[in-house]
Amino acid sequence: MILSNRNGLKNTRNMLRVFGGLNETYSCTEAEYSAGINFSARNFPALSTRLPRRKLRETAELNGMYHLNGLLMVCGTRLVYTPDDPDELEVTLENAVEDGKKTLVGIGTKILIFPDKLAFDTVSREVSALGAVWSGANASMEFAPCDAEGRVYEVSGSGPSEPENPKDGQLFLRVEDPEKPWSSESTLEVYSEASGNWSAVVLDCCRISAKGVGANFRAEDTVALSGSGAEQAGQWSGLDGDRIVRDASEDALRVRADPGGEWFYGRLTRTGAAVRWVSLDGSVRREFVSAETVRLERRVPDMDYLTECDNRIWGCSSKENVIYACKLGDPSNWFSYRGIAADSYAVTVGSDGAFTGAATCMGYALFFKENTLHKLYGSKPSDFQLSSLRCRGVAKGAARSLCVINETLYYLSPDGVMAWDGSIPTKVSTALDPARLRNVKSALGGALDGRYYLHLVRGSGEAQTVRLLVYDTERGLWQEEDVCSYEMTGSGGQLYLWDGKAVWAADAEREENWQRADSLEEGVRFELVSGDIGLDRPEEQYLSRLTLRLEAEAKSRFELAVSYDGGAWETLAQRTADGRRCFDIPFVPRRCGSLRLRLKGRGQITLRSLTRTSAAARGGILAQEVN
């Protein structure tokens, strides 16, 4: 028997074992997914659901979080601090702050709280004000010239030449101009019997005495003094202004003040608006009225964006074009200009637009506008330098998206998510829908194990949309998780998130007693929609079989569905696992131009592989061609 030659139909098989991440663009491939939630690249090249979170505590109001030797939470008007050391007790401070959103930054052992301008000390567990104000509207106070030790002197005589036969320690005012005997041109002298000489007493300070005047100030503070009336009295020509506090006690403080004025050698006493000047020997009195109120203030500028760099807090405001830096290691002094390396610093920038954020990266203090990056560098105020770069900066409302991961700064710009490594910012969000990254109302960033968490809020009211995107910086893959991130802060080894009701730890295994079932998230809800499958096949082939290999890591259930050529979803399989188990799910698809797969459920699963079997087409690829 002779059989005629017949053409064989050869099948080809391809196994996809390397999966990408979220790709919302037209270029989404079979290895990526076009939409999905709660998947991660933790088991790359496989695709796994994210790890369950652990609930740490419930709180319905949270205005900010920061981690420094422990977790500080601003809950309404309360401060709650939980130390990292489990043997230490949690601290709660009632009515410590005003109710409202906070900007927090750490320096040393302190966490600064703005706009309240407070500092929480993680060692003493106390809150203190950065600024301080004393006002003497009705107070009785005295201004008197004094020496470096704070001593105020009284003289028994004055004249153009020293008296004969003086006693040891005798004081005398040597007058240079008889018409102005009490002016700073005269010299206060003291006699020393041991040396037999008169020596000048330098009065280069002013002692300010009043009830409670020095309670909130300390040595080396720079305070702004106003309303003293000293210039009106002719005692000091420039006492009002910024003064350096040499020492302070409850009811007195000493400030640096150069001698100057026609009525310098005397005491100035104020009681309300009444002002009296009395010479050092009590022989001359002068009285007048001053409408000004004496005020002493340690000023702290209003700032919206803060960062720490080289033991200084740097800040700026969206309302002015000035960058501030505090005194070295002292966040309570912002206007200390003494010509030394520890001075405060301020610089005005000339770029247009408002500041939108601040951060520190690679040793630089960085300040952003929507179209500009300002970089400050140097070791001390005398050699600080400011450079500017026109580039895609931080979007308005996205100041908290700034986050440093592995020496690279990530942030949300008006054009998408950017990465800055010291040169030019580069865009890393090309796989995301750009329309969903624009016109953001607020953005918040966090970091954990090389992953960049980005919380986005767009719109308001019923039209408001909220997303939590996760970028794997090592692999360049995007994922999306369910929103649990209205507030975020990281400790380096953990990421804390607040969902509006409770605070969660992103990695439950890093918390103490993480196995407790009552605190672990129950069954992670997940969903994934693949990219179009089949678009890369030649016309002479069609998909004859698809096989998914999945692994359940814990108690899980899931459903697999398919959509042909953009049609309705058709359920292919439903599976349940009580523990770790592997599944092979094969199915024979209809002939179509392309198909998409949807995988959704609850639990912990890993997509290990997707095997495609293609066969030669006879009668056309599409179903309508066969018919």
At which residue positions do the language-model features occur?
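Short loop/turn segments that connect beta-strands within the blades of beta-propeller domains
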Residues: 68, 75-76, 107, 114-116, ...
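Small/polar beta-strand repeat architecture
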Residues: 4-8, 130-131, 182-187, 191-300
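Conserved beta-strand position repeated once per blade in WD40 beta-propeller domains
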Residues: 64, 103-104, 305, 357, ...
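N-terminal beta-propeller domains
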Residues: 1-88, 142-149, 298-375, 456-470
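Beta-sheet repeat architectures centered on beta-propellers
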Residues: 2-70, 394-397, 407-408, 415, ...
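Short, surface-exposed terminal/edge motifs of secreted or surface/virion proteins that either
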Residues: 81, 117-133, 170-202, 234-237, ...
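Trp- and S/T/G-rich repeat-edge/linker motifs of beta-rich repeat architectures
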Residues: 39-59, 79-99, 121-152, 194-203, ...
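Short hydrophobic/aromatic-rich beta-strand motifs
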Residues: 71-72, 109-113, 163-190, 220-226, ...
